Amino acid sequence: MTQTLVVKIGTSSLTHPKTGDLSLSTIAVLVETLSKLRRQGQRIVLVSSGAVGVGCGRLGLSERPRTMALKQAVAAVGQGRLMRIYDDFFTTLNQPIAQVLLTRGDLVQRQRYLNAYNTFQELFNLGVIPIVNENDTVAVDELKFGDNDTLSALVASLVEADWLFLLTDVDRLYSADPRQQPDAQPISVVNSIEELAQVQVGDRGSIWGTGGMATKITAAEIAGEAGVRTVITEGRSPVNIERILAGEALGTQFEPQPRPINARKRWIAHALVPTGKLYLDRGAVQAIAQLGKSLLAAGIVQVEGVFQSQDAVLLCDRAGQEIGRGLVNYNSQELEKIQGRRSEEIPTILGYSGAETVVHRDNLVLS
């Protein structure tokens, strides 16, 4: 049976930790593994970190850039070298590849999101393995994925993948960082993210990367909502992917949600960047969270931020606790005028007719 696999390999697995130089032996095994799976009929996406790390090695920099401009310049150097090496390795196995560089903006606008989906489908039909990275050279802080764990989860959601493999510098998730606490207990299966409330996930994984275990857990949650099974496993042993697909209990597997969120709501929940907040009274919170209702103007007690109609906003209770996200039918200036008012009063207040709901339930997803 044909399956869609998204494989993310981190900088710590791709490079030597002290120098930032590429680990060609790891890349060779990764390429051979993915090419073999592709020949077996699987659809493969590789999300590869390493552009900044490789760029540092190429330019002789001893540490990761601290400023955005320098990081973007170094990424431009490293991305070209990284893709050249991938192309050389995949070409020896007659496996075509494609470079796909994404920014958050490509997923924020619905039409661009759908265009990206269609592009991936055509690449699959052509037998190509897309190699994805964030377009660091043009990304801005407001529209950055932040790490490739998040990017890989959003790509897995976008392409409706069956599996997301997060290849990292540990063999699985532990109750604490095993490098700091030798008695940390391995975790083989996670049925619900809530099970990990007591896990000490630490922060940054390595000096060359940007993600730690916390970002991988978040990625697993995003993917799980899309019905994608996520596995955290050892990055320097890419053959583990085949073994896991064959049924071996390696790494940590995150079970997907039994009832995945539909594609549009996944887009609202994770791809969009909220531009404002709406604070709601208790009745509105209950109507949305417990009864599945749309948000009406009467339930809004405060409007925060400047946004336009159809922008994404956070929906919060009076204390500021996020309860959901949604697409608004009014801009922030209009909402400041109609907040707390009944729907039938809106035409009189604004001087024109508008939507009865501020956020329709079809455009609302609970957090």
Swiss-Prot record:
Binding site for substrate: S49, D136, N148
GO BP term, pick one: L-proline biosynthetic process
NCBIfam families in UniProt: proB
Gene Ontology CC: one annotated term: cytosol
Keywords associated with the record: Amino-acid biosynthesis, ATP-binding, Cytoplasm, Kinase, Nucleotide-binding, Proline biosynthesis, Transferase
Highest classification ranks of the organism: Bacteria, Bacillati, Cyanobacteriota, Cyanophyceae, Gomontiellales
EC number per UniProt: 2.7.2.11
CDD domains: AAK_G5K_ProB, PUA_G5K
Name by which UniProt lists this protein: Glutamate 5-kinase
Protein's organism: Cyanothece sp. (strain PCC 7425 / ATCC 29141)
